[in-house]
Amino acid sequence: MPEMDIENNIKIISQPVSLLELKQTAKLIFGDMVKGVVDLEKKIMAIGGELHADEEAFLMNHGSIQQNLWGVNLYPDRTFPELVEFDSMINIRPRQNNRSRSVEDENTRKLILKVIGDLIEK
């Protein structure tokens, strides 16, 4: 069972989840989308929060390091990799040469897609 913040519906995903579970999580807040934060070092992600910042804080409280965390939006009705949208305020970090809400470094985007691809059942 994933670690979970009951108050904010945030859970840490370390084992593959189904698209059905993502769709159910989406319905709780946004309808068609799930916010997620990926930890590139631990190869896990947090989902289910209303804000990427809440998921980021949850992961950091569980030992993640901020520089390894990247925010995405997941649209479970789309196919992979189109279901991933790189758009989050937590991604703005000039010290890592990322000056927008997107993920500007192509290698970092590929790593994020790899982690997400491994954590979502096809």
Where are these regions (language model features)?
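Intrinsically disordered, low-complexity regulatory segments enriched in Ser/Thr/Pro
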Residues: P76-V103
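Short histidine-centered catalytic/ligand-binding loop motif
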Residues: S18-A26, P94-D105
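Eukaryotic low-complexity, non-globular regulatory regions
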Residues: P2-N9
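Well-ordered alpha/beta subsegment
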Residues: R101-K122
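Short, mixed-charge, low-aromatic patches
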Residues: I13, A26-F30, I65-N73
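Negatively charged, low-complexity tracts enriched in Asp/Glu with abundant Ser/Thr
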Residues: S14-F58
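Amphipathic, interaction-prone secondary-structure segments
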Residues: E50-P81
